[in-house]
């Protein structure tokens, strides 16, 4: 039985005070409060700047055992197996056992490039839970992409959005879903996540963060629906 991890794609939105967070809660206490209600977060800030070991350690110290951080690879890493990737791989161990998947996102203008994907996958440690979120539709049509991901044990993020859906491709260790709709079928998703966890893989589901407190409340509602399963902790 795998474990189900549920969260949002950020945790420090000021507009969540007075709803998800108590009014007046200092920003430095937001993560600890968040982790008391959800067991994972997809970190959006690392897309724009490289995380530091000290920053990652500080995050890890604020959350309980069993919590997971899904880290977005910085934009400058892209699909390039160079110095930025090496730096990212060097700092990630600072999270210790709180490290979950690492999400690599390609920009909407980047067409499918199986060669670039293969070069990056060749540089990733097999133990890393690598997940890819391809924004150009050509990646879904390129047959080599799924083959390369499966060979490397990497996953493709599933997408449930108003613009359409992308089916998740499980990795060797996890299944990853990004729930981008403001309204999604909570009961249906809970059943789906439980069924996937029963296959033995860890399952991650992240609700899109919004400026208001609705998104974390939707994540909590999904977690409560899933909580009847022993896979959620």
Spans of model-derived segments:
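Residues lining hydrophobic/aromatic ligand-binding pockets adjacent to catalytic sites
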Residues: 1-233
């Amino acid at each position: 039985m795998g474990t189900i991890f549920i969260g949002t794609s950020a945790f420090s939105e000021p507009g969540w005070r007075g709803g998800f967070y108590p009014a007046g809660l200092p920003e430095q206490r937001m993560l600890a409060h968040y982790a008391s209600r959800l067991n994972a977060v997809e970190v959006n800030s690392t897309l724009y700047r490289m995380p530091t070991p000290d920053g990652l350690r500080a995050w890890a110290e604020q959350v309980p055992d069993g919590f997971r951080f899904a880290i977005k690879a910085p934009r400058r890493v892209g699909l390039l197996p160079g110095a930025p990737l090496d730096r990212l791989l060097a700092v990630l161990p600072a999270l210790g056992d709180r490290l979950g998947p690492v999400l690599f996102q390609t920009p909407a203008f980047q067409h499918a490039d199986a060669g670039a994907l293969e070069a990056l996958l060749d540089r990733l440690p097999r133990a890393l839970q690598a997940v890819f979120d391809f924004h150009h539709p050509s990646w879904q049509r390129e047959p080599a992409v799924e083959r390369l991901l499966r060979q490397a044990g990497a996953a493709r993020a599933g997408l449930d959005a108003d613009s359409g859906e992308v089916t998740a491709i499980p990795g060797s260790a996890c299944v990853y879903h990004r729930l981008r709709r403001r309204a999604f079928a909570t009961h249906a998703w809970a059943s789906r996540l439980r069924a996937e966890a029963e296959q033995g893989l860890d399952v991650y589901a992240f609700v899109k963060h919004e400026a208001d407190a609705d998104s974390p409340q939707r994540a909590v509602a999904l977690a409560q629906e899933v909580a009847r399963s022993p896979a959620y902790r």
